[in-house]
C-alpha cells in the first residue's frame, strides 16, 4: 500500500475528550472517529487491525472444532420473551417496533437466536456435540459509554455456543475453549490471566474471564504469587488466619457525636483501623426478616457478589435506606454495630477473629469500645463477605495474593440448561425420549482486544503492537527525500515490489513530507519494522533498519537486506 493512495488520518494533538491511552492513540493514529456517543467509524488503519485480530480468532476457533455461522443483529422480541430475558435484561437492551408494530431488539448477545436455530436444525443426539460461532456486531445501550471502543454501545464480538447431551460433554468442550482462548491471546502477544468469574446476567454455573492486565482496566484481578490460582476479585475467597485473642479491657460506651464514619472515628480517637468494624444494612431475602446486618472490618470492602449469595440476603443485593434503618434500629448509619442489634447479623471471617474492637452502639452519637465476641455479644453467623486484599493467603494454600487491574477481553460460561429448558430445545436421546440440550457459551470482545493491546503496549511515540500478526502493516518503507533523489526512489520502488511479491504486508511512504513527519507517523501507528532509505547510506551500500518493539537500530548491507528482513519477520 502506498500512503499516497491511502487514507492516512493521523493527528498531532490528543483530543481533549479521550481519557485512556487506547482511546487517545486510536484517534491520533487514525484508527477510529466518533460518530455519536459510543458509536465509532473504523478508518482503514483501524479496520486492518480489526480484521487481523478476527483472523487469529477465526483460525484458532476453527482449530478447536468450532463452526462459523452468521446470525442477524435484529432479533424478534418473542425469543427474548420465551427465554424470560425480555423483562430481566434492563435498559441496555435496545427495543423497537417495525412498521407492522412487531417488537424487535438490537442484539446485545445471541443466546436466544442460537438456541432457536439449533432446536430447528438439530433433532438427534447423534448430531451433538456441536459448537457454532460468529463474529458479529452487538449493541448494548450503555448508560455512559466511555474509554473509546473499550466501552462503546456498538462493538464487534466473537460469540460461540455449544450444545451437548451431557454435562461431561460440555466440560470437554469448555476445556477445549479454555485452551483455544489461551492460544488466541498468546498469539496476540497479550499479558493475560484466565480467572474464575461470576456468571452475571448470562447465567449458568462455571465461568472464566480472560483479563488483559492494564492499569486502566475496570476489573480487579487476583492471582497467587506461587501458583496458577487466579480469580476476579468478586469471586476470590478471603482466608482469615490466626486466632481470636482474649479480651484485655472492659467494654465501654463512648460519646462520639462527630464520628459518623470509620475514618472520623479512627482519627478522633486514635484507633487502629483494623480494630474497628463497620455495619452495613441490606435488604433481606425473607419478608419476615426485611433487614440484615453485614459486619466487616473497618479497612475492608464489602463484596456484594459474595454477600448476595447468602440465603438471608436479597439477590441482587440492595442497601436499606436511612429511613428504614432508623425506623427499625433507632440509630443512623454512622452509629450502627453488633451490640444489642435487633436484626439478624452476618459477620465476615476476619471479624470473627477480632477482639477489643470498636463498633457503633445503635444509639446516635455513641460507640462501644473494647467489644469482644461471646463476652459482650453473641457470635453471629460467620460468612465470607469481603474483598481480598494484597498479601492475603491464596485460597489454594500456595503463596499470597497480588491484585492488578484487568480489562475483560473474553468470557466463557457453562450455561447448563438455562436457555434450552426455557425454549424447549430438545433432541431425541439414545432412549428415544426428548432430551434437553446442555449449553456453553464463549465470547471475545474483538474491538476491545484492539484497545487492550494498545493499553498494554505503547510508549510516548505511539502504539507498539505486541504481535506482528495484528499490526496494520508489517513493514514500512521510509525513503528520505525520495522526490529529490532518483537513486532513493528507484531502490524504494524495487524493494516495495519485491516485498509485495513475497506476500509481506508493506506500506510505502511516498508522500512529499519531511522525514521527521514520516518517522513520527509510522511510529504512531506502530509499524513493527521500518526500513529507512537515505541517499548517503545508499551510496555506502547500506540501509537503516528500525524495530518498533525493541527500539533496535542497525545498518544492513543492501545485498543482505531481504534475507535479514525475512529472518526478522519470521519468514512471513
Curated annotation (Swiss-Prot):
The lineage of its organism: Bacteria, Pseudomonadati, Pseudomonadota, Gammaproteobacteria, Pasteurellales. Keywords: Aminoacyl-tRNA synthetase, ATP-binding, Cytoplasm, Ligase, Nucleotide-binding, Protein biosynthesis. CDD domains: ProRS-INS, ProRS_anticodon_short, ProRS_core_prok. GO terms for molecular function: aminoacyl-tRNA deacylase activity; ATP binding; proline-tRNA ligase activity. It catalyses: tRNA(Pro) + L-proline + ATP = L-prolyl-tRNA(Pro) + AMP + diphosphate. InterPro entries: aa-tRNA-synt_IIb (IPR002314), aa-tRNA-synth_II (IPR006195), aa-tRNA-synth_II/BPL/LPL (IPR045864), Anticodon-bd (IPR004154), Anticodon-bd_dom_sf (IPR036621), Pro-tRNA-ligase_IIa (IPR002316), Pro-tRNA-synth_IIa_bac-type (IPR004500), Pro-tRNA-Synthase_IIa_type1 (IPR023717). It is an enzyme of class 6 (ligase). The keyword Zinc does not apply. This is Proline--tRNA ligase. PANTHER family: MITOCHONDRIAL RIBOSOME PROTEIN L39/PROLYL-TRNA LIGASE FAMILY MEMBER, PROLINE--TRNA LIGASE. Consists of three domains: the N-terminal catalytic domain, the editing domain and the C-terminal anticodon-binding domain. It is found in: Cytoplasm. Gene3D superfamilies: Anticodon-binding domain, Bira Bifunctional Protein, Domain 2. Catalyzes the attachment of proline to tRNA(Pro) in a two-step reaction: proline is first activated by ATP to form Pro-AMP and then transferred to the acceptor end of tRNA(Pro). As ProRS can inadvertently accommodate and process non-cognate amino acids such as alanine and cysteine, to avoid such errors it has two additional distinct editing activities against alanine. One activity is designated as 'pretransfer' editing and involves the tRNA(Pro)-independent hydrolysis of activated Ala-AMP.
